[in-house]
């Protein structure tokens, strides 16, 4: 039926009176080609006034109502893919070329010649001038990196690490300036550099617009709240009494009992001088001027210096303190 409609269209077609207008005709089939199936891939376009020059378009077929259909055979499934209907044959040919290049790439057979475009690969990491400017403001140690590493990443590794860490360490580094020693292990020498972290981080934040986190004061946070609550509770509690010093022996010359021992030795020395000066011819001595006397056999009177010293020795013995010097 389609063949009959095509023959009817050809018989009723009249030439355009305007010689500058294009008109399209189907190619006449030769006696040899009549036996084979008609191909729907090619369409002959004849331009009036241009002689006998003809143009064939692959994958374009003219409809009886004057429009042009484009289709292509899928190389994988061997099926025809419908591309659409167009007003002109050139539009249908362009649609076929696009589909052919999508299926077969550079090996596709197209109706028109297309220039081979050289596609430049985009860099893996592209840094603008604003992002690379903080390195000029903040001096960093120059590391001897390989040239292939710089070409692949587009920037030195030290700069990328610094830009990444400056986002998370902004609040911690804004209140201090540190001088960090840097050991150059490649050249065998040691050097130091001083960089202001406050200026670097603030400049990088303003230029790169990397304010991902809200700015907070340095005295905020969970730890600060815990410390404040702890201080509030301790304000109403009275201070605990100081711990007593540990009990030490006479051999230890520190603490309370060492002072007691020194005082005891001085008191024994004074007592000896007093006794030696007041011994009488009977072997008795007068301890004080208040009339209280003591016998040399060891008996002591209440209120004398000897009694106070003996009481002190007894108190020291109960606490574990021993004296090296004996009585008398």
Curated annotation (Swiss-Prot):
GO terms for cellular component: cytosol; nucleus. It is found in: Nucleus. Residues 1-55 are annotated as: Disordered. It comes from the Eukaryota. Interacts with class 3 HD-ZIP proteins such as ATHB-8, CNA, PHB, PHV, and REV. Regulates gene expression patterns in meristems and thus modulates organ development. Required for correct embryo patterning and cotyledon organogenesis. Modulates auxin signaling pathway in early embryos. Involved in the cytokinin signaling pathway that promotes shoot regeneration. Acts as a transcriptional activator. Binds to the GCC-box pathogenesis-related promoter element. May be involved in the regulation of gene expression by stress factors and by components of stress signal transduction pathways. PANTHER family: AP2 DOMAIN CLASS TRANSCRIPTION FACTOR, ETHYLENE-RESPONSIVE TRANSCRIPTION FACTOR ESR1. This is Ethylene-responsive transcription factor ESR1. It comes from Arabidopsis thaliana (Mouse-ear cress).
């Amino acid at each position: 039926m389609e063949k009959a409609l095509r023959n009817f269209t050809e018989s009723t077609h009249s030439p355009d009176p305007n010689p500058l207008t294009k008109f399209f005709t189907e190619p006449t089939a030769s006696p040899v080609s009549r036996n084979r199936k008609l191909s729907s891939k090619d369409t002959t376009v004849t331009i009036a006034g241009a002689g006998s020059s003809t143009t064939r378009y692959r994958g374009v077929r003219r409809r009886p109502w004057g429009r042009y259909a484009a289709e292509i055979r899928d190389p994988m499934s061997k099926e025809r893919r419908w591309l659409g209907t167009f007003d002109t044959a050139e539009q249908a040919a362009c649609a076929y070329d696009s589909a052919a290049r999508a299926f077969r790439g550079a090996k596709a057979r197209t109706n028109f010649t297309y220039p081979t475009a050289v596609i430049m690969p985009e860099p893996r990491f592209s840094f603008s001038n604003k992002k690379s400017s903080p390195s000029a403001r903040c001096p960093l140690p120059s590391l001897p990196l390989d040239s292939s590493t710089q070409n692949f990443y587009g920037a030195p590794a030290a700069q990328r690490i610094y830009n990444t860490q400056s986002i998370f360490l902004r609040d911690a580094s804004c209140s201090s300036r540190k001088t960090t020693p840097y050991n150059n292990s490649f050249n065998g020498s040691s050097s130091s550099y001083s960089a202001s972290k406050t200026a670097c981080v603030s400049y990088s934040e303003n230029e790169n617009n990397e304010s991902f986190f809200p700015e907070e004061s340095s005295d905020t946070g969970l730890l600060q709240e815990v410390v404040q609550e702890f201080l509030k509770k301790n304000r109403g509690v009275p201070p605990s009494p100081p711990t007593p010093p540990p009990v030490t022996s006479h051999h230890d010359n520190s603490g309370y009992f060492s002072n007691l021992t020194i005082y005891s030795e001085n008191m024994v020395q004074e007592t000896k001088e007093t006794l030696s000066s007041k011994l009488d011819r009977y072997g008795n001595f007068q301890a004080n001027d208040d009339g209280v006397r003591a016998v040399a056999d060891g008996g002591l009177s209440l209120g004398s210096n000897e009694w106070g010293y003996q009481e002190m020795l007894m108190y020291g013995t109960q606490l574990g303190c021993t004296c090296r010097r004996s009585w008398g």
